[in-house]
């Protein structure tokens, strides 16, 4: 595998001015918060990559007491991206991510974005029929989920276009003391997946990227589709909501603009 080389990334800006014909009485109550912003005209992956290059040693997230820096996070994202390309994922393909708030969910979300695929985000506790509907609506070709949810996906697999099921495990991302406690409590309740099950275990999946010697990153636009989320279905059948790169990136910039006291390294 070729060693990656990086050059300083220049991200263009994009604005969405408020038309003069639109009445905005609430602007008078915003204080010092700007009414409009200059948004980064890039993908979700490019935004995270730029931050990781700028603050490599800063803590990106804390999971059950285990710290991960931006550099470590970006390394894992790129590793996943190469592995996705190795198993044949192409630009525009849908990848269903059915994970709780865990490190693998972060890695897979941004890896999916890096290669130009679309992340279909669903709740892992959804019922089988709901999962089947989400997979059919999105036409997903890959599912990433935890070991304890495997049986639900295998039960409806033949009714979908799923080619690969990638299995992650919570225990793999825990520190040693926490892992020991987890395996003595929640971990022991998980039904083992049969050794001959048609799945790709996370550790095996991570190693597949070593075979990727070509450019795995795909250049996309800020307003291209990036993520699919689902409505609650309170007024009818649940619907897939397609969000763009800039939908996510804008939210992060709006949070910072609304909280000017935030500084690199602060926790939220």
Residue ranges and their predicted role:
Residues 5-20, 37-60, 75:
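A short N-terminal helical cap/helix-turn-helix that marks the beginning
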Residues 24-35:
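Short, contiguous pre-domain boundary segments
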Residues 38-40, 49, 57-102, 106-110, ...:
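Conserved AMP-binding/adenylate-forming core of the ANL superfamily
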Residues 81, 94, 100-128, 136-142, ...:
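A short helix-loop-beta submotif of the ANL/AMP-binding
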Residues 84-90, 209-224, 228-268:
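Conserved adenylate-forming
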Residues 124-159, 251-268:
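Conserved ATP-dependent adenylate/AMP-binding module captured primarily in the ANL superfamily
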Residues 155-222:
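ANL superfamily adenylate-forming
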